[in-house]
UniProtKB/Swiss-Prot annotation:
Pathway field: Protein modification; protein ubiquitination
GO CC terms in record: endoplasmic reticulum membrane
GO molecular-function terms, A-Z: ligase activity; ubiquitin protein ligase activity; zinc ion binding
Parts forming coiled coils: 186-236
GO BP: any one term: protein ubiquitination
Family annotation (Pfam families): zf-B_box, zf-RING_UBOX
Subcellular location: Endoplasmic reticulum membrane
Lineage of source species: Eukaryota, Metazoa, Chordata, Craniata, Vertebrata
Record keywords, A-Z: Coiled coil, Endoplasmic reticulum, Ligase, Membrane, Metal-binding, Transmembrane, Transmembrane helix, Ubl conjugation pathway, Zinc, Zinc-finger
Function according to Swiss-Prot or TrEMBL: E3 ubiquitin ligase involved in the retrotranslocation and turnover of membrane and secretory proteins from the ER through a set of processes named ER-associated degradation (ERAD). This process acts on misfolded proteins as well as in the regulated degradation of correctly folded proteins.
Stated name of the protein: Tripartite motif-containing 13
SUPFAM superfamilies for this protein: B-box zinc-binding domain, RING/U-box
Primary location: endoplasmic reticulum
Domain notes: The C-terminal transmembrane domain is indispensable for the localization to the ER.
Length: 404
């Protein structure tokens, strides 16, 4: 068609010939184009010879009316214009240039002659376009009802459930992140790195929640969009009377329907399981972790086996030694108080002799001296406790400075 249009184009205006006139040199031009050239060369006293725009051959200027009409060329142009406005037959995608003029009744597709004889449709049943049009017209109504009655309400309900579950999950994760932030704001700056690390884990969990729900949500939205497009396509060609156009649109409509029907719906059990996996946690569980084990803190949704496996805190060796000293002192104080006061100034041998000569005190004196010993032991315990506390604070501060 493009090559034919070149031969039907006027060399002057570059448009299809309109009332073509032929010169003596056999070249044809539009009547209006020739009139424009002659009007430009017209003089009141003298008319120069007219030269052909193509071959430059001179022609006697006797006016446009004297030129013959090219009836053959005008008829060809008129037929070309009628053919150009007619709908073009679709061509086969597999065999270039071959028109789709056969309908395969087995695969329900438009095919070309090569497809029917040598392609995948060899041996299938074929029918004329008019017959196929009547069959597919009946099948269209049934397929339209299938698409129209597709479980759109169920998809909308499922989509709302997914969005609601996603919102609840993200809100729960956000609340947990806030609680984690509040907890770590109360700690020393040595815990800042761990706080950021756990918040990063929570952000990763948010991403995991979105990666879990978003694909299903997007897939269902795409299915609804495909349903809408299929209905629009169906509404646009359900009243077509041209068999070729109807069958071609029917083929696209079947593809849309196949995509819609192949979209599975997620089960509510999967949604409930995804939401139940985000269990609540209590930040007070971290109170059991000692400062030297901060790096072993578990994120809220990680395994808490570490906390349950922590051994009970053993008393520091320094504290155990102090208590032993206290017990020895408490045991010796009663004996020292029972000795005569002048015995303390004697030599070791004299003390032995003095011990052999003193008598046991009365029960009242024993009770009085026991009370005195208890007060002395309590004072010593208070002093040692204060000493231990100061030592532990110094140890914690030193460790904190070392970690920071």
């Amino acid at each position: 068609m493009e090559l034919l249009e070149e031969d039907l184009t006027c060399p002057i205006c570059c448009c299809l010939f309109e009332d073509p006139r032929v010169l003596p040199c056999s070249h044809s031009f539009c009547k209006k184009c020739l009139e424009g050239i002659l009007d430009g060369n017209r003089s009141p006293t003298w008319r120069p010879p007219f030269k052909c725009p193509t071959c430059r051959k001179e022609t006697v200027h006797n006016g446009i009316a004297s030129l013959q009409v090219n009836y053959s060329l005008r008829g060809i142009v008129e037929k070309y214009n009628r053919i150009r406005v007619m709908p073009r037959m679709s061509q086969c995608r597999v065999h270039s240039g071959q028109p789709l003029n056969i309908f395969c009744a087995t695969d329900l597709k438009l095919i070309c002659g090569f497809c029917a004889t040598t392609g995948d449709h060899k041996g299938h049943k074929f029918c004329a376009l008019e017959e196929a049009y009547e069959r597919e017209k009946l099948a269209f109504e049934e397929l339209f009802r299938v698409v129209e009655g597709w479980k759109g309400a169920e998809v909308h309900s499922c989509l709302e459930s997914l969005e609601s579950a996603k919102k609840k999950a993200l809100e729960r994760v956000s609340r947990d992140a806030d609680r984690v932030s509040e907890y770590f704001d109360k700690l020393l700056r040595t815990l800042e790195h761990k706080r950021s690390e756990i918040l990063s884990d929570l952000e990763t969990l948010k991403l995991a929640v979105m990666q879990t729900f978003d694909p299903e949500i997007n897939r269902l939205r795409s299915a609804l969009e495909e349903q809408r497009r299929a209905l629009n396509i169906a509404e646009s060609f359900r009243s077509l009377s041209d068999p070729l156009t109807f069958l071609q649109q029917m083929q696209d409509f079947r593809e849309k329907l196949r995509v819609i029907q192949g979209t599975p719906l997620p089960s509510r059990t999967d949604m409930d399981v995804s939401l139940s996996a985000l269990q609540s946690f209590d930040v007070k569980e971290w109170d059991r972790v000692r400062l030297g084990q901060v790096d072993k803190l578990c994120a809220p949704y990680e395994s808490s086996a570490y906390l349950s496996s922590l051994p009970p805190a053993a008393a520091p060796r320094f504290t155990r030694v102090m208590w032993r000293v206290v017990l020895v002192v408490c045991a010796c104080l009663p004996a020292l108080n029972f000795l005569p006061s002048d015995c303390l100034a004697l030599s070791f041998q004299d003390k032995v002799v003095a011990l052999g000569g003193f008598s046991l005190p009365s029960p009242g004196e024993i009770v009085r001296w026991l009370g005195f010993c208890w007060k002395e032991a309590a004072s010593i315990c208070t002093l040692l406790t204060e000493l231990c506390r100061n030592c532990m604070l110094d140890l914690i501060n030193t460790t904190s400075d070392f970690i920071s």
